[in-house]
Design a protein with these regions (language model features):
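Short C-terminal tail/terminal secondary-structure segment
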Residues: 2, 82-85, 136, 213, ...
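Canonical Rossmann dinucleotide-binding motif of NAD(H)/NADP(H)-dependent dehydrogenases/reductases
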Residues: 3-38
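Substrate-binding pocket helix/loop in short-chain dehydrogenase/reductase
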Residues: 86-88, 95-98, 126, 205
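Active-site helix of classical SDR
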Residues: 111, 148, 156
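Alpha-helical segment proximal to the catalytic Tyr-Lys
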Residues: 116, 161-162, 233
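Residue(s) in the substrate-gating loop at a strand-loop-helix junction
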Residues: 131
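Short, small/polar-rich loop/turn modules that mediate ligand/substrate recognition or access, typified
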Residues: 164, 169, 235-237
């Protein structure tokens, strides 16, 4: 790729994109399919090894991307964890601290590093990967995870108000059941909590989905890519469910 092409192509950073079967990797692919130059961050398996809880690591990596391409147009905050017990009395301080550090502090670190570059070039788009658990509480989900995703939705809305005048659009996607490792863990927790088999737990969870099946990472990624695109030019501060109708009656 020539220098001129690098400088003219839109550039996106996607965090939490190291797992090949996750929403982050799918989002990176969807953005590349739209013509973006995409740089991925994760602890391993990504273009840059970055711990999003470390503000200096994040700032250094974002600066390197902006310096390499000359600008930054989009940020997808996908890095997240869901750890610990769904029983409040069994939740440890370590699990709470890690969940909030990655899911909330990590997101803020990335936004604080990326937004100054967007301000310099007159705008950009940020998509925060929240969760259906950021819109409503669900059974068999660690309380710290639910709290962190409500925080992501709140941050999305408040940051959208602050940076809208600067033409930086900030939205959240709220996936419901997605066919990832995190879903498998949630089904295991549900089975344990209800005292049922994994097969019955999966059937119970699937029964709450109006469309009858869990989403694929690529289906969530399609919404992420849309929100980064000019087709979403008038959308900011939104928290969009991608849940197969799980919130249909909510």
């Amino acid at each position: 790729m020539t220098t001129d092409t690098r400088e003219s192509a839109k550039v996106a950073i996607v965090t939490g994109a190291g797992h090949p079967d996750g929403i982050g990797a799918a989002s990176a692919k969807a953005l590349r399919d739209q013509g973006y130059e995409v740089i991925t961050f994760d602890l391993e398996g990504a273009d840059h090894a970055v711990d999003v809880t470390d503000a200096q690591q994040v700032a250094t990596a974002v600066q390197a991307v902006a310096a390499d391409f000359g600008h930054l147009d989009a940020l997808v905050n996908n890095a997240g964890v869901g750890v610990g017990s769904a029983n409040l009395l069994e939740q440890t301080s370590e699990d709470l601290d890690l969940t909030l550090a990655v899911n909330v502090k990590g997101l803020v670190n990335c936004c604080q590093a990326a937004i100054p570059h967007m301000l310099q070039t007159g705008g950009g788009a940020i998509v925060n990967v929240a969760s259906l658990c950021g819109l409503r509480a669900l059974p068999a989900i660690p309380h710290a995870y639910t709290a962190s995703k409500f925080a992501v939705v709140g941050l999305t809305k408040s940051m959208a108000l602050e940076f809208g005048p600067n033409h930086i659009r900030i939205n959240a996607v709220c996936p419901g059941s997605v066919d990832t490792q995190m879903r498998s863990k949630a089904i295991s927790l549900l089975a344990e909590q209800e005292g049922i088999s994994l097969e019955d737990a999966e059937a119970l969870e699937t029964s709450t989905i109006s469309l009858g099946s869990a989403a694929t990472p690529s289906e969530v990624a399609a919404v992420v890519a849309f929100l980064c695109s000019e087709n979403a030019a008038q959308i900011t501060g939104a928290a969009i469910p991608v849940d197969g109708g799980m919130t249909g009656g909510f």
